């Protein structure tokens, strides 16, 4: 959405260790450079694509749009499955529950909705935010949802009751991203106020604040797969990987993509080497080597700003979605 309405050689080895399965010795070595190609282009949304997310079980891809709908597609074949309708305004973000049965959505109508994916029915509407809801995330246990809003607050919700259990006055400008860590004990939030903040899920207590260089607006935040680091995007064409516990140190900086205007999603690729994948305002997808920070591949095909990207949980598949002139979701596969 548009703004306005030390070396890690040791640490990165355990950044991904939880994701990697035991491999037989004859397994091919991990490639030094990725080789993704366009496999499917999915049409159907009537406005900009705001968020794409794979289900944790790997079967489905969900896409959300400014057209007020969520669409469900087959993750492997791109086949359209169903549309989830009910929001009164555009949707900015979506998240899956761990069992892949529920989706929550954040909308400009100031609500969060919970959906049963199989039936396509809306289960609950969560009300409390006073402005656009911009980001949502399920905790790993999927009994809580965290949301961030343009009202500068972060809220934690009980999935079963739909009640807000915690309201945190988190920032002094709109909240642009929220995410739970891998055990659900922490929440990270980012904001246009130039800070990334870490919160205790249970108490709502502020544990740490990371301030960006020159107070640059934070456009995206996400915990690393093991929860030890935070990836943050800022509106100066930069992604940074931070340690947040005590030294609050910027460990890696990734530049080359274009990001000065929109809140663009980035993510970790854990299935084929150690990459960071991000959208970009030059209509490309950028893949960075996490360790060396080099751009190892760019993916061309979209005809507008690539606002959102996601990586499949087990296969070498990337999904992407773009803005108004494009309106497509694309699925890319590693060859």
Curated annotation (Swiss-Prot):
GO biological process terms, semicolon-separated: transcription initiation-coupled chromatin remodeling
One CC-aspect GO term: Set1C/COMPASS complex
Disordered: annotated segments: 1-30
Subcellular location per the Swiss-Prot or TrEMBL entry: Nucleus
Compositionally biased region (Low complexity): 9-30
PROSITE patterns per record: WD_REPEATS_1 (PS00678), WD_REPEATS_2 (PS50082), WD_REPEATS_REGION (PS50294)
PANTHER family referenced in this protein's UniProt entry, alphabetically: WD REPEAT DOMAIN 5B, WD40 REPEAT PROTEIN
Subunit structure: May interact with the histone-lysine N-methyltransferase complex.
Protein name: WD repeat-containing protein 5 homolog
Organism: Dictyostelium discoideum
């Amino acid at each position: 959405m548009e703004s306005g309405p030390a070396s890690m050689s040791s640490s990165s080895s355990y950044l991904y260790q939880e994701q990697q399965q035991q491999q037989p010795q004859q397994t091919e070595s991990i490639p030094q450079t990725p080789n993704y190609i366009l496999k499917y282009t999915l049409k159907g949304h009537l406005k900009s694509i705001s968020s794409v997310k794979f289900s944790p079980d790997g079967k489905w891809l969900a896409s959300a749009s400014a057209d007020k709908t969520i669409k469900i597609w087959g993750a492997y074949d791109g086949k359209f499955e169903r549309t989830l309708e009910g929001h009164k305004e555009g949707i900015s973000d979506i998240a899956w529950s761990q069992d892949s049965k529920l989706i929550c959505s954040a909308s400009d109508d100031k609500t969060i909705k919970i959906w049963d994916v199989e039936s396509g029915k809306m289960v609950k509407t969560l009300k409390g935010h006073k402005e656009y809801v911009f980001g949502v995330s399920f905790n790993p246990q999927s009994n809580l949802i965290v949301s961030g809003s343009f009202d500068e607050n972060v809220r934690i919700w009980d999935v079963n009751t739909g009640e807000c259990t915690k309201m945190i006055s988190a920032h002094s400008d709109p909240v642009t991203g929220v995410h739970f860590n891998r055990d659900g004990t922490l929440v990270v939030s980012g904001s246009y106020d130039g800070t990334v903040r870490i919160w205790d899920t249970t108490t709502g207590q502020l544990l740490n604040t990371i301030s960006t260089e020159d107070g640059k607006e934070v456009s995206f935040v996400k915990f690393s797969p093991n929860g030890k680091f935070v990836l943050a995007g800022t509106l100066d064409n930069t992604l940074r990987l931070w340690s947040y516990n005590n030294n609050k140190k910027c460990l890696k900086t990734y530049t080359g993509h274009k990001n000065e205007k929109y809140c663009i999603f980035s993510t970790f690729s854990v299935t084929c080497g150690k990459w960071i994948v991000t959208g970009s305002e030059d209509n490309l997808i950028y893949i960075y080597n996490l360790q060396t920070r080099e751009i190892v591949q760019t993916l061309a095909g979209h005809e507008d700003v690539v606002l959102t990207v996601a990586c499949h949980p087990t296969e070498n598949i990337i999904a992407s979605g773009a803005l108004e002139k494009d309106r497509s979701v694309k699925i890319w596969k590693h060859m």
